């Protein structure tokens, strides 16, 4: 049974929270005295009205949520948040197309960072701040924020969290989820503030520092500059952002363990070690290629490689260099990183490293099984046996993401987008990365995509952000059955 009133109440509260965020951006617009102020005021009125109507409809709701309600709330929340979040762009006239405005907002809320803007600097400060804030909110999840608020209304947030964190994670957060959510948001905010301070020390304006800190911790990648991080020509800024993108790619429950003094448990985590060594391996490989086959000196080759590898693997999408100008072997590694992603339970997109670890262990077991058909070969990660059901889920997820990628690549090719560009756009969208390949690489916007392709990409961003099953489950007949 789906609790419609409770769902309306939660979504209404979400819209009221979005209104508060829009009002913050209204303050920024007022401070700079720019012409986007009316758009924010209209948006605040519309969003408040819609939120109050939904909250009113759910005022006498039974205070409980099922897992089914959780999946529905998560999917609707991202769509509704994006639909209302696009209004400042659209009403201000800076993005006069509904398709483009929704694409830009979904790209932010899903922490993808792909943009249709040809010149980012044309946007006034209020819209730039809202654009940056969408990825910061989306990075950790609109729903996770709500979980920290839900206990105020006496609602158990476990079912909602189960839908948002549908991938395999380090540890399930159970009855004390409200407390844990507050801890995570405190850490998230603290990391953002430290990043802001360090970027400002490096010469960025305070406004740019805040916006880029939002982008780095949310692994979104929206910059306030068309040239992205290349605009600043600062090795210091590149190293600082590399550090914070790396941190944001770590499972936040592990960061919580670190903050609470459980260092040993954190550093022995199998997924974290895989994530770290992937970055080391790809960075050294690309550094060697750039050093040997281009005119870059050793330090520049290393810094460029490190920044782009972390940026792409964490699905942030910042750019200091157009990797499409690199030797083919070097830029050919980018789609692998896009699809792989960082750690589960982080703000990054992609398949997540833990799934890769499980797949590798399953593959190794199959070789052993060929030699020892009757052997019992459990898969252990962090000293815990991975249940066959979880192994099946990982295999199903892998098959599904490859199937969706293949189908959408064909769809984009049917829209007369070349093969290389289609592959890059699809993998970047479903991996929530941002830059793609070819004409949609880091040096270009996605404005040239046909409108139909932009809607396909928006759907892929949503699917990637919510781990596929959360959204696709809504289209199965069993989901809507009463029992």
Map each language-model feature to its residues.
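Membrane-proximal intracellular helices of multi-pass ion channels
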Residues: 1-483
């Amino acid at each position: 049974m789906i609790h419609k009133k409770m769902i309306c109440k939660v979504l209404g509260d979400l819209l009221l929270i979005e209104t508060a965020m829009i009002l913050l951006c209204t303050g920024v617009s007022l401070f700079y005295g720019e012409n986007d102020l009316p758009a924010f005021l209209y948006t605040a009125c519309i969003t408040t009205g819609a939120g109050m109507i939904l909250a009113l409809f759910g005022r006498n709701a039974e205070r409980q949520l099922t897992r089914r309600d959780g999946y529905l709330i998560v999917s609707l929340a991202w769509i509704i948040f994006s639909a209302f979040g696009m209004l400042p762009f659209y009403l201000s006239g800076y993005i006069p197309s509904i398709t483009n405005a929704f694409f830009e907002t979904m790209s932010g809320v899903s922490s993808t960072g792909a943009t249709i803007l040809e010149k980012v600097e044309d946007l006034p400060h209020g819209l730039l701040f809202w654009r940056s804030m969408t990825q910061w909110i989306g990075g950790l999840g609109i729903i996770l924020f709500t979980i920290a608020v839900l206990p105020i209304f006496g609602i158990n947030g476990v079912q909602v969290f189960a839908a948002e964190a549908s991938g395999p994670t380090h540890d399930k957060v159970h009855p004390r989820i409200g407390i844990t959510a507050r801890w995570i948001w405190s850490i998230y905010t603290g990391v953002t503030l430290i990043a802001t301070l360090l970027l400002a020390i490096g010469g960025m304006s305070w406004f740019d520092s805040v916006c880029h800190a939002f982008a780095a911790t949310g692994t979104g990648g929206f910059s306030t500059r068309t040239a992205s991080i290349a605009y600043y020509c600062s090795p210091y800024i590149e190293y600082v952002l590399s550090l914070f993108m790396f941190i944001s790619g770590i499972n936040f429950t592990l960061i919580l363990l670190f903050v609470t003094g459980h260092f040993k448990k954190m550093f022995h985590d199998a997924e974290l070690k895989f994530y770290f060594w992937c970055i080391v391996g790809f960075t050294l490989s690309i550094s060697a290629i750039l050093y040997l086959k281009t005119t870059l000196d050793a330090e520049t080759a290393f810094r460029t490689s490190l920044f782009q590898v972390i940026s792409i693997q964490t699905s942030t999408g910042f750019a200091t260099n157009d990797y499409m100008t690199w030797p083919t072997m070097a830029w050919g590694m980018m789609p692998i990183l896009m699809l792989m992603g960082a750690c589960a339970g982080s703000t990054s997109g992609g398949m997540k490293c833990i799934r890769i670890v499980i797949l590798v262990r399953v593959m190794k077991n199959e070789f052993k099984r060929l030699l020892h058909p009757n052997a019992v070969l459990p898969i252990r990660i962090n000293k815990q046996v991975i249940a066959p059901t979880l192994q099946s889920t990982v295999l199903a997820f892998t098959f599904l993401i490859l199937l969706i990628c293949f189908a959408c690549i064909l769809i984009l090719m049917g829209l007369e987008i070349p093969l290389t560009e289609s592959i890059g756009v699809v993998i970047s969208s479903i991996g929530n990365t941002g830059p793609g390949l070819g004409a949609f690489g880091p040096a270009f916007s996605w404005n040239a995509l046909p409108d139909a392709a932009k809607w396909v990409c928006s759907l892929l961003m949503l699917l990637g952000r919510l781990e596929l099953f959360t959204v696709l489950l809504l289209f199965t007949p069993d989901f809507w059955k009463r029992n």
